[in-house]
Amino acid sequence: MKRIAAMAWRTLRGSVQWRVLWLWHATFMVGVSGIVKDDEGRVLLLRHRLWPEHRQWGLPTGYAKRSETFEDTVSREVLEETGLTVRVRDLVNLESGYRLRVEVAYTADLIGGDINLDSFEVLEAQWFATDRLPEGLLESHRTLIQKTR
């Protein structure tokens, strides 16, 4: 039986094999966060409109689009949410084990731009010293920031 299954698999080839694998295995979203720092080492935090009121502060974050690199997701999300441009640097976190998502985080340096908020998603944006982070900061984001000090 295994031999027949292997022969059938080999006859499928390329894109058909990928479609079968996609249907057979878990599919998930990838949440991407950017730890954006300016020239003074301050970190960019956003007060997110759609997050629970007691923990609205967090890093710029969003979900990767199909065929988009995670680095491109960081750049896109920061630009969409704040109007700022960044240079994405290092992967600092990869977390799995969630039911429907994987989370990744990258460091990024501010390149330029003026803050122009996406008022649907973001209430405000501020730069914070890493030793003076606000109350209401998502705890997992606090941990990520501390990893990059």
Task: Give the predicted meaning of each segment.
Residues 117-148:
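NUDIX/MutT-family hydrolases
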Residues 1-33:
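Acidic, metal-coordinating catalytic segment for phosphate/diphosphate chemistry
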Residues 38, 42-80:
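Conserved Nudix-box catalytic region and its N-terminal flanking loop in Nudix hydrolases
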Residues 26, 51, 94-99, 119:
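A short beta-turn/loop motif at secondary-structure boundaries
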Residues 84-93:
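A short coil-to-beta-strand element that immediately follows conserved catalytic motifs
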Residues 95-116, 126:
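Active-site-adjacent beta-strand/loop module that shapes the phosphate/pyrophosphate-binding cleft
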Residues 28, 55, 100-102:
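Residue-level preference for beta-strand/loop junctions
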